A protein has these predicted regions:
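Non-catalytic all-alpha helical scaffold/repeat segments
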Residues: 27-288
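Bacterial N-terminal signal peptides that target proteins for export
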Residues: 1-12
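Sec/Tat signal peptide C-region and signal peptidase I cleavage site
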Residues: 22-26
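Generic extreme N-terminus detector
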Residues: 5-6, 21, 230
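Bacterial N-terminal signal peptides
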Residues: 10-21
Length: 289
């Protein structure tokens, strides 16, 4: 990407520009000349899109200028990106479930686009290591929220709707996307040359908190493969702190695995009800004669 303006000339002067419209209106916030969403309220998918558009423009003209995780000026922007408060509207039970599910799906898509902006695998070392890994762990939480809403929506469907090929395909795609995201999240723990020790240690601690919420929604074979990878990381990872985080995660996931298997076994053991015979309203043969 072309970088035409040196950051040191513009950053002290134009890092943030707040223009207050009136006491009752929200402040307009600009980052290096690009308008971004209000960081004082939860973001939705449209806010993430606005941020993504702004940061793409910034990244095309400024070197090393994306918001940092702990920057004095940019920290609040990044913290809003990965704030738990952003999930509250999606989990608001008084809002229509299907709308909340669609919003969670759109937000996850834009988070993945933000990750692509922050990750640069052409680089020997990641320029935004902490920020990129933070977005990955936050995306796992968003994926778990989407799965929760998808499950709730699924339970509202009739048996015929649940067996609808289109519905089943949508559920399959959601599970496949979650499996891919989870696998990628663990892949990053092995990139010790591109990410520093401090960043990977923090990331592994975040993963140990986020993975259980998503693990329960994964398919049986994916859960089994994930447990094997966690065990390998707990024994063989380069950094002892990462090993410790994975060891703490293991019993949590194993407990979930046993619980899921127990419920599946109980469901299989349930006697299947014979189909109810339809009421025969035809005239008996003898009466008809």
């Amino acid at each position: 990407m072309p970088h035409t303006l040196p950051l040191r000339c513009t950053l002290p002067l134009a890092i943030l520009l707040l223009v207050l419209l009136s006491p009752v209106q929200a402040a307009e916030l600009f980052y290096l000349g690009q308008k971004i969403p209000d960081i004082h309220k939860p973001w939705n998918s449209a806010d993430y899109q606005q941020l993504l558009d702004a940061l793409n423009k910034v990244d095309s003209t400024q070197l090393n200028a994306l918001p940092r995780r702990s920057g004095e000026f940019t920290g609040p922007i990044y913290q809003r990106m990965v704030s738990e408060e952003n999930f509250r509207p999606q989990l608001n039970i008084y809002a229509p479930l299907e709308l909340r599910q669609n919003e969670a799906r759109e937000a996850l898509f834009r988070l993945k686009e933000l990750m692509r902006l922050y990750f640069d695998f052409r680089a020997v070392q990641q320029p935004y290591a902490a920020e990129a890994l933070g977005l990955m762990s936050y995306s796992l939480r968003q994926q778990a929220v989407l799965f929760t809403l998808t499950t709730e929506f699924w339970m509202t469907l009739s048996a015929s709707e649940q067996s609808n090929p289109v519905r089943l395909q949508g559920l399959h795609e959601t599970k496949a996307a979650a499996a891919m995201l989870t696998s990628s999240a663990l892949d990053y723990l092995g990139l010790t040359k591109q990410f520093g020790r401090e960043e990977l240690v923090l990331y592994s601690a975040e993963l140990s908190k986020q993975l259980p919420g998503l693990f329960i929604h994964l398919s049986t074979d994916v859960r089994a493969a994930l447990l094997q990878r966690i065990e390998q990381l707990a024994q063989q990872h380069t950094y002892s702190e990462v090993q410790a985080s994975m060891r703490e995660l293991q019993p949590v996931l194993l407990s979930i695995q046993r619980d899921v298997q127990s419920k599946l076994a109980a469901a299989e053991a349930q006697p299947r009800q014979a189909p109810t015979r339809s009421l025969d309203l035809s005239v008996p043969t003898e009466s008809a004669q």
